[in-house]
Amino acid sequence: MSRRCDSDAVNFRKDGDSPQWPKLIGTAAASSLATLFLVRNFFPAEKKVRHSIRADYTVGDDTFVRTMGNLLGPPLLEGNKVTPLENGDQIFPAMLNGIRSAQRTITFENFLFREGEVSDAFAEALADRARNGVKVHFLQDALGCDAVHGRAIKLMKRAGVAVEIFRFVHFSRINFRTHRKILVIDGVRGFIGGVGIADDWKGTGRTHGLWRDSHYEVRGPVVAQLQQAFMDNWLETRAELLHGDPYFPTQERAGDQTCQIFKSSAGEGSDSGRL
């Protein structure tokens, strides 16, 4: 009896049953890949620096202005005008007005672009300017677009808009995106902020399910820095350098505000945040 029990205990797999170890190995491999994906995309390797924050300067200190320019790259520039825009009912009309007024160039970099009324309006405005001889450059993040081959993108391409998709999604770099929202008109009028080109931002920000957000219209010398920020990812994606007066015209003084465009990217980790 005991021998039969021992035999039954050893020979637990019946004829026709599949072995379990391939499934266990597959599960372990999948878990390892998932862990590697999370670590690679959300916890980039970088040296951790712990320190207290001291108030070394006041905002109006000339030394602060010089230091910020030296550390962050571009200098702080005087003579700008910044107009705050709140929510879709202010932001979208201002941006569309800027696009429709363009005479020479439009550069537009965006993260979120979802098909709907808002994206259709922007696609039609950009397409119209391209048909009228304006050089239109549209750079769209791959992950943020729900229809890379949708009607809006196709409309722009048919009209002559130079459309580029930034970093098609790859497993090991899925989180390396561009979240920049940059629109520059004729090199002299810029828009920057948090809004996406989607119906989710329509209205006043008081409707349930729709976003509240801020954007800014910028005029003056700092627009050249905004244009240069667009050129970073355009050059990476298309290997085309946009230059000359149509993109970088002489900037006139537009107001009395001091501004600086500070750039960051996914590959920089938290270094930019520390600065």
Residue ranges of each PLM-predicted region?
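Charged, low-complexity N-terminal segments of organelle-associated membrane proteins
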Residues: 1-7
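Charged, low-complexity intrinsically disordered terminal segments
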Residues: 11-275
